[in-house]
Amino acid sequence: MYKRQTVGIVDDVTFRSLPVGEEISLAKPGTFEALFFGLGADGTVGANKNSIKIIGGTTNKYCQAYFSYDSKKSGGYTSSHLRFGDLPITSPYLVTTPDFVACHVPSYVDKYDVLKGLKAGGSFLLNSVHDAATTCETLPAHMKAYLAKNKINFYIINATKIAAELGLGSRTNTIMQSAFFKIANVIPFDKAVEQMKKAIQKSYGKKGEDIVNMNYAAVDAGGDAVVKVEIPAEWASIEDKGFVHVSDASCPEFVRKIVEPINGLKGDDLPVSAFTGREDGTWENGTAAYEKRGIAVNVPEWKIENCIQCNQCAYVCPHAVIRPFLATEAEAAASGVEWKQGLGETKDYKFRIQISPLDCTGCSNCVDVCPAKEKALVMKPLESQLPQQRNWDYIVKNIGYKQVVDKTKSVKNLQFAQPLFEFSGACAGCGETPYIKAISQLFGEKMMVANATGCTSIYSGSAPSTPYCTNDKGQGPAWANSLFEDNAEFGLGMHVGVEKLRDRIQESMEQAIAGCTKCSDELKGVMQEWIAARGSSAKSAEVSARLIPMMEACGCDYCKDILEMKDWLVKKSQWIIGGDGWGYDIGFGGVDHVLASGLDVNILVVDTEVYSNTGGQSSKSTPVGAVAKFASAGKRIRKKDLGAIAMTYGYVYVAQVSIGASQMQLFNVLKEAEAYPGPSLVIAYAPCINHGIKGGMTRTQTVGKEAVSCGYWHLWHYNPQLEEQGKNPFVMDSKEPDWSKFRDFLMKEVRYTSLKKSFPAEAEELFAAAEENAKWRYNSYQRLAKMEY
C-alpha cells in the first residue's frame, strides 16, 4: 500500500519519516566553501555580500552566497554561506561542510556548534576579546578536541576592541572581512584591500568622510591584527563528546524541550511529538526570559552612592533589563548584595537598582537619561558584570515586586511594578519598546493586544521568543497578530467578542437578581454594583474581588454560569498596536473604521516615520526632506497629520507623545487614554536605527527631547471629556520651540545629511520647507489651544 513519507522531519507520531544520514560534501572539485556566524546589525551579512562581489568582480570564479538569519530586529543570530570556484556552482542549499569558518561573536562558542562540518585542514577565525593563551583556556573541550584532531588552522583577532577604538561601536564587519581575505588568500591581499576600500566609498560615501575613514582604518587593522594560534598537541587526546547544551533543570518543560533546542539552532531536530497539544499554534508567554543572549559588549554598572532613586533608567530601558527593587531589612540582609535606604514613600524599605547583564543589549540609554550630578550608571565590559546575573536571579525569585506604592501616581512609582513586556528582540536603543513596556506596567494584568505586522510584531512574537509575560498570579497580556492591513479591525473584533461574553455575565446577574432565591440580598447588591461598574477597569476589578468568593459560596446555577466566565469579570484593556506604515498607510482605513465605531479601544502608533521592519521605506509619516527608500532624493510632500484627522470626530481621545521629551506627559496620556470611555489614539515619536542618528542609538531619549525642543515634534492631547466640562479639549503640552535649533536637529541624522551631500541645492530648499511645515503645524495647534469654550 502506498504511504507518504517525509524527509527532514522526525515523525514519531505517524512514523512516516525517513532518517537523514551524515552530512556529505557534494561540492565540485576546487569549490571553496565558507561559513560566517554573526550578530544581527553587526554588519556581517553586508560585509559578506561585498566579499562575494569582490571575488566575483576580480577573478574568473563562479560565486554564490546565501544568508540566514532570525527575525530579531538586531542582536539575533546570522549566518552567511559563501561558495566560489572554477566550475559552475549548482548547490541550492546552505553550506554544511565548510573549508573556512569565522565566528564574529565570542559568546557563540558556548551557544552553538560553530565547528560542525568544518573540513580537516580547514581554517577557523574567532573574534576573541582575549589573547591567545586566555582564548585557549576558555574554549570548550569539544572545540579543542575538534581543532586538534582535524588539524584546523586556528586564528584569532580582537575585532571588538578594534571596532571600539576606531569609533565603530559593535560593527566588527569590516575588520573581520579584512581578516578573512588575509587568511583565505583567495585573491592577493593588497588587491582585496583596494577593492574593500572601493566598496566602502560606495556604501558609506554619502554618510560622511569620517565614516569612510573609520572603515578604511578597519580594513587595515583587520589584516594586521590576525594572530595564528598554535594548537597544543595535548588537545588531540581530549575526548570529543561533541557540542552539548546544558539545560537548567529549573526551567519549565516547554522551555527545555522546545524553546532551548530552537534557540540552539536544533529546532529542525525536534520530533513531532514535542508539539502534542499545541497543534493550534498556542505558545507559552515569557519565553524571552530564558534566552540570556549575552550579546552586549558593555553593560551598565550601578553606582549606589550616586543614585538619587528617580527610576528614570528603568522607565526608558527598551528591554526592561534594569529595574528598581524594594526589600525589607531581612530580605536585604539575606540577599548578600548592597542596598540603600529608600526615599519618600519607600523610606521604610531598602532600595536597589538591579541589572540583568545577559539580557542587556548595551544601548546605554539608561546612562544617557541618568540625571544624577555624577552618573549612577557607567558602562562596563560584560564579563565584569556577570556576577550581577546571579543577583538578578536571586532578587526576582526571592524578593520580587512589592505593591507598596500607587503605581498610577508617578513615573517613579510605576517602575516598581513588574514589566509584563521584557527582553524583546528589538534593536539596542529601540525607540518603540519603552512605550509598550510602560503600557504593560500600567495595564498588563488585564491587557489584550492586537499587533499589526511590522517591527512591533516581530519583536513581540517570533517563535520561540515571546517577551509578553505574566505576574505571580498568572495574569498578563494576551497577544495575537493577524495581518498588516486588518489589525485595527482584528483588535476591534477582540473587544466586541469580550464584551459579548460580559453581556452574558450581565444577563445572568440580572436573572439572578430578579428570580434567584439562593442568592442573598448582599450578593445581589454586589451584582448590581458590578453591572454599574462593568465599564471601569479599576471599579470592576474591585467589585469582582468581592463578588467571586460570594458566588462560590452561593453555588446556585446562575453563580456557576458566571464563575465559568469569571476571567471576563474585570474590564479588559484592549490595545491595538502598530507602526506608522500601518497606522498612516496600509491600515489607515481600518484605523479610521475603529475610531468611527465609538467603541472603547486604545490604539498606539509608534511613529518612526518610515517602514522600519522592511528596511526604511517612505511612509505618509515621512517628513519633507527626509531620505528614505522610494524617496532617495528627499520626500517632497509634507507629513500626514494623523492626530488632526482623528480629532475631527470630536469623540476620540487623541495624543501625541515623546518619552524622551516628557516622561510625565506620556504617563498621564496613557492613563487618560485607557480611562476614556471611547476610542483613543496615541501617536508616539520613536527614534529608529533607520534614521542614522549621529552618536547612535545610545541617544534615543535625547533625540526625542531635541525633536520637541526644536519644533520637529509636538506634544499635545485632545480629551473630549474636557469639552463636557466647558473647557478646551485641546491642550498643548510642549513649550514654544526654539526654531533656531531645527536645522541643527536635522543635521544630526543621516536621513537628512545624506540629501545635503547628494543634492545640496535641493536639500536647502527641502530643509527650509520642512521647517516651514513644522511651523505651520505648530501654529495650527496653537490656534486650537487658544479657542474659547
Residue ranges, per PLM feature:
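Conserved small/polar residues in nucleotide/adenosyl-binding loops
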Residues: 1-2
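Flexible loop/turn segments at secondary-structure boundaries
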Residues: 13-14, 42-46, 72-74, 109-111, ...
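Thiamine diphosphate
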Residues: 18-26, 32-120, 312, 432-448, ...
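Active-site cofactor/cluster-binding pocket
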Residues: 28-40, 44-260, 331-336, 617, ...
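A structural-propensity feature for long, helix-poor, extended segments
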Residues: 67-105, 209, 219-220, 465-515, ...
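Glycine-rich ThDP/TPP pyrophosphate-binding loop and its adjacent helix/strand module
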Residues: 114, 556, 570-576, 585-602, ...
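Short internal beta-strands
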Residues: 123-129, 452, 603-607
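Ferredoxin-type iron-sulfur electron-transfer modules and their immediate structural context
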Residues: 192-196, 205-360, 367-575, 626, ...
